[in-house]
């Protein structure tokens, strides 16, 4: 092959690689700016509270509510069975908090989109603090109540595969509470299903079930934890 042609081809490849790298960096920076405008931030350290109370499914979120016990949605749990796995607070690292098998699944008997799962205490893959689930996470406490205009945050795994299982936090306010339904304006995306809705004290108010209308809607929905729902959850927390 002509030596000059080889040199030119290698130079062109180097330029293309450089341009591709720059383009990827620009896209990532643009995405981060867009998230910032929506009051969404990437969590840097998921080994501290409240972030290590959140767990990831392959395409959704859950959170810890007691010993070996997590909450998510029915529309999430329907795709899982006993023996399937969840990951505790990953942040681009699948083993950050350990990987655990599901031991049981209990769906709320009403129409509300809530499911309680009990988890095997010993990890399939250890977390940063060993093989014990409860050593690697911290359970959330229930909020006493909530009202319209309260500040809230949502922590979870939006678009988990696309975002390489990085954890994100979005902030907003409560717009409406009616019976078991809570509406809020914090930004969410697919993958946030099962995320905790937290008050300013990091106490859990409810569980995200989805957006209302288009993706990224500013009017989103969660199941509000009424006394009846709290009682159901409490009965399924492992003692």
Swiss-Prot record:
This is Serine protease SplC. It is found in: Secreted. The gene is splC. It comes from Staphylococcus aureus (strain MRSA252). GO terms for cellular component: extracellular region. One of its GO terms (molecular function) is serine-type endopeptidase activity. Its EC number is 3.4.21.-. Keywords: Hydrolase, Protease, Secreted, Serine protease, Signal. Its main location: secreted.
């Amino acid at each position: 092959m002509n030596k000059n042609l080889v040199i030119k081809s290698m130079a062109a490849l180097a330029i293309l690689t450089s341009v591709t790298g720059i383009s990827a960096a620009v896209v990532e920076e643009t995405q981060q700016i867009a998230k910032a405008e929506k009051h969404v931030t990437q969590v840097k350290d998921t080994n501290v509270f409240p972030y290590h109370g959140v767990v990831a499914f392959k395409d959704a979120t859950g959170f810890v509510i007691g010993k070996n016990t997590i909450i998510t949605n029915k529309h999430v749990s329907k795709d899982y069975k006993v023996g399937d796995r969840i990951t505790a607070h990953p942040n681009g690292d699948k083993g950050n908090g350990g990987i655990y098998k599901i031991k049981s699944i209990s769906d709320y008997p009403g129409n509300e989109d809530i499911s309680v799962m009990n988890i095997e205490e010993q990890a399939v893959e250890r977390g940063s603090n060993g093989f014990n689930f409860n050593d690697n996470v911290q359970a959330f406490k229930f909020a006493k109540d909530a009202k319209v205009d309260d500040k809230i945050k949502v922590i979870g795994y939006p678009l988990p595969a696309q975002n390489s299982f990085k954890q994100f936090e979005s902030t907003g306010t409560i717009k409406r509470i009616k019976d078991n339904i809570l509406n809020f304006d914090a930004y969410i995306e697919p993958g946030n299903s099962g995320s905790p809705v937290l008050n300013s004290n990091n106490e859990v108010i409810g569980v995200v079930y989805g957006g209302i209308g288009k993706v990224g809607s500013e009017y989103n929905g969660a199941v509000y934890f009424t006394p009846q729902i709290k009682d159901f959850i409490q009965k399924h927390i492992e003692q």
